[in-house]
Regions:
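Classical Sec-dependent N-terminal signal peptides that target proteins to the secretory pathway
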Residues: 3-30
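Hydrophobic (often cysteine-bearing) scaffold residues that line and stabilize catalytic clefts
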Residues: 16, 127, 201-204, 279-280, ...
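N-terminal low-structure segments adjacent to metalloprotease catalytic domains
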Residues: 30-210, 214
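Pan-zinc metallopeptidase signature
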Residues: 128, 132, 156-174, 178, ...
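Auxiliary, metal-adjacent structural segments of Zn-dependent hydrolase domains
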Residues: 197-266
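Active-site recognition of the HExxH zinc-binding catalytic motif
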Residues: 212, 281-295, 305-309, 313
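Short pre-active-site segment immediately N-terminal to the catalytic Zn-binding motif
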Residues: 262-283, 295-300
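Post-HExxH zinc-binding segment in Zn-dependent metallohydrolases
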Residues: 297-339
Length: 365
């Protein structure tokens, strides 16, 4: 998923208006003077403020500024904030914003995140998420993957992803990885569980057939040939399929005599170095193609691929691991008309009527 970092949710500038009041003590000689406030005659000592004359009592009552924190007179420069006045010391100690990270006063631009306020530098260095690949703060577009890793969006253009878990293959995220072919890579987290040799295939085939027997699919061939293919391009050419995400393919040949099928041959091809859970899910998908061939059930492409994807879904649900949950999430979010939308149509039908009735209903779809 691509996000824009909550870089600066709010930027504010503290503006301290400092006004210096000079209280001038003056004695009148000669010219008669009057108080600006009460209009009474001034005799003896009086105060001059901004060119106007005041009795001391009138000045204290009407002109004198008081601190809105301690309620004492302000006799020198002061700070204002949100229409209130403060001694400089009162403002710094009780009113002025402090960084919620370092605790120091905030005097300029600051960042607000989740109701807390930070110096710009504190926000960047301590609050912003750090890229799990380059460890730098993420201040622009970033990816948060299924596994909880954060990284800059641009790393996706430079670093290959694992063919199984889709993590970016790097020392930091996957402890490295290896290439299977020109366009296929596997990370070292998935490596211990991949299917890459013929000796593994019989075990995997038996496991999947056993899962199918539990839902009433009992007549699938138990010795069907399965071949591993390294290159996805080779698999695409072999199948004549244009779907770029292809992971398996089943070839089917039949022999007929007098219009009747007397023999059927199947051969399944699956990408090598798939994680065992994914390999079994792909194998289940291909075996359901065999089921359709066996029973001469010809479905529209969305029902056909959607039905076969029910096999993959069944395998992932049996594992219930985080990897299988990730693959199920992708299946449920896939927008492809056949493999995504078609799958969800068939899954909805399966959830309503169950496997037994669905298998009976297939020929009529």
């Amino acid at each position: 998923s691509i996000y824009h970092v909550w870089k600066i949710l709010m930027i504010k500038r503290l503006v301290n208006f400092t006004v210096v009041y000079f209280l001038l003590l003056s004695i009148s000689f000669g010219t008669q003077k009057y108080c600006k406030s009460c209009k009474g005659e001034l005799t003896g000592q009086y105060l001059i403020h901004k060119g106007n004359n005041y009795h001391r009592s009138c000045y204290d009552k009407h002109i004198q500024i008081y601190c809105d924190h301690c309620n004492r007179k302000i006799e020198a420069s002061y700070n204002t904030s949100k229409g209130k006045n403060y001694h400089k010391r009162c403002f710094q100690q009780h009113i002025q914003k402090r960084c919620d990270e370092c605790g120091d006063l905030i005097n300029g631009i600051y960042n607000v995140h989740e109701g807390k306020e930070y110096h710009e530098s504190c926000y960047v260095n301590h609050i912003l998420p750090k890229c799990d690949i380059c460890y730098q703060p993420v201040e622009d577009k970033y990816i948060k993957d299924f596994w909880g890793n954060y990284y800059h969006h641009y790393h996706e253009d430079k670093i290959p992803s694992c063919d199984n878990c889709n993590r970016l293959i790097s020392k930091q995220l996957t402890k490295g990885g290896f290439s299977v072919s020109a366009n296929r890579f596997v990370c070292n987290l998935c490596k211990p569980n991949v299917v890459k040799t013929k000796s593994q295939l019989n075990k995997n085939l038996a496991e999947v057939l056993n899962v199918f027997k539990k839902i009433g699919i009992n007549e699938l061939p138990e010795r069907i040939p399965v071949t591993l293919v390294d290159s996805k391009d080779d698999l695409i050419k072999m199948s004549g399929h244009r779907h770029g995400n292809i992971q398996g393919y089943t070839s089917y040949e039949e022999s007929t005599l007098a219009g009747k099928i007397i023999d059927q041959d199947y051969h399944i091809y699956i990408l090598s170095n798939l994680h065992e859970e994914i390999f079994n899910a792909v194998l289940a998908h291909e075996l359901l193609h065999v089921y359709l061939f066996q029973n001469q059930i010809d479905l529209k492409s969305d029902f056909r691929e959607g039905f076969c994807n029910l096999g993959s879904s069944l395998i992932y649900e049996n594992y219930s691991s985080k990897l299988s949950k990730y693959r199920l999430k992708n299946m449920n979010e896939n927008t492809d008309p056949d493999y995504g939308i078609g799958f969800r149509k068939m899954k909805s039908m399966l959830d309503k009527i169950g496997w037994k009735r669905l298998l009976k209903k297939l020929p009529r779809l």
